């Protein structure tokens, strides 16, 4: 009888179909060499990366995505180390958003990108053109997208 009850419960408990996506731009970068296409974080950026770690430490992040640039990888590194996850690299120019959504169903995901890619990423997730490019000096935007079945909610907050 217990075995039947266990089997029944295993098949009757719905799988969590809700997903949460946190999307941020990389922290402040070194700007002394305008021709450097892959700068590292400056001192303020290193501090912001630590602040992001403190923000995300209790969010139960299950996957971390980052572009393959020094500034994004350095932004995510303290978070990655604190929660013990590997970073999954992605390219904004080649991402299939429908596949991204389906492969992260039921997950709590952090995505780190750039001022000119994160707003579009959010727009693709929510299937609407709500957000515009981030000002180049703004590194504090946090976009939150929640998806439960066909219900999608989104929010933009500033985290300093």
Predicted regions and their residues:
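Generic beta-sheet signal
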Residues: 21, 105-113
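Active-site-proximal alpha-helix that buttresses catalytic centers in soluble enzyme cores
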Residues: 18-103, 118-124, 128-160
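A residue-level detector for conformationally permissive "hinge/kink" positions
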Residues: 2-4, 37, 105
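Bacterial Sec-dependent N-terminal signal peptides
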Residues: 1-20
């Amino acid at each position: 009888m217990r075995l039947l009850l266990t089997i029944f419960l295993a098949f009757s408990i719905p799988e969590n179909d809700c997903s949460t996506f946190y999307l941020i731009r990389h922290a402040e970068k070194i700007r002394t060499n305008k021709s450097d296409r892959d700068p590292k974080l400056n001192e303020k950026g290193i501090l912001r990366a630590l602040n992001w770690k403190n923000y995300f430490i209790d969010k139960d992040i299950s996957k971390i995505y980052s572009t393959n640039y020094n500034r994004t990888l350095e932004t995510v590194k303290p978070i990655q180390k604190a929660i013990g996850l590997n970073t999954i690299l992605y390219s904004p120019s080649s991402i299939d958003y429908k596949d991204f959504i389906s492969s992260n169903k039921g997950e709590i995901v952090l995505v780190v990108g750039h001022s000119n890619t994160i707003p579009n990423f959010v727009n693709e997730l929510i299937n609407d053109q709500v957000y515009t490019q981030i000002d180049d000096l703004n590194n504090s935007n946090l976009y939150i997208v929640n998806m439960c079945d066909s219900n999608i909610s989104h929010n933009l907050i500033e985290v300093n």
